[in-house]
Amino acid sequence: INKHKKIKSTKNFFVTKNLKEIFLKTNTFIIIVLNEKQCEKIVNKFIEIKKNIKINKNHTIINCATVSPNWVEKIYKKLKKNNFEYIDCPVSGGPKKAISGNLSLILSSKKNIYKKNFALLKDIGNNIYNLGNKIGTGSTVKIINNCLAGIQILSAAEAIMLAKKEKINLKKIFKIINNSSGQSWMFADRGKRMIEKKYIKPLSRLSIFKKDMKLANN
């Protein structure tokens, strides 16, 4: 949550700092935070609340954070013991697509749980890729995607610097590459920003980039 931005409750959703209040109002929870540590803190709190209020019915956690498949397997076993269902559902697309509801969802889940939550998933993203019931596969594919994206950002920077060193017009280089075999989404988007030097509004954090590369390396 952006601490500097005050979000108010409306007729369509409510804002609260109390996880117990959320727990009593719904059976399905979407987690989208920075890392495994933050995810686990929320999961542990939900398990604790469930034990304290003694509710036996199943709840579903849809985890949209980018985490390692090993962590997913570990947390899934823990949740299963406490009557929670789990959808491994990392997302891709950044802030723009999040606002418009056009994220890509790369998920793995039990078939019945996927079907039960399909309408909700459809509200989050319009590109839903279901990789089957092996929990953790969604996170594996997301890490592969992020690995490729990271390499493309670095190679875009190298290509631009090489062109600059050789005193070649960068706008022309950009146009040529985007219409040639070196084209990529990252070059078209981030490469353009590098050339235009438009860094006023950052689109991602370096810490997230490093985290994603570390997950891929591991």
Model-predicted segments: where are they?
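NAD(P)-binding Rossmann-fold cofactor-contacting core
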Residues: 1-11
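Conserved SAM-binding strand-loop segment of SAM-dependent methyltransferases
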Residues: 12-18
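Rossmann-like NAD(P)(H) cofactor-binding subdomain of soluble oxidoreductases
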Residues: 19-24, 28-31, 35-103
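Rossmann-fold dinucleotide-binding core
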Residues: 66-146
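Active-site-proximal catalytic alpha-helix in oxidoreductases
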Residues: 100-107, 129, 135-166, 176-189
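Beta-strand segments within the central parallel beta-sheet cores of soluble alpha/beta enzyme folds
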Residues: 120, 171-179
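Interdomain hinge/lid region at the active-site interface
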Residues: 139, 148, 185-218
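Amphipathic alpha-helical segments within well-ordered protein domains
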Residues: 157-161, 174, 195, 214-217
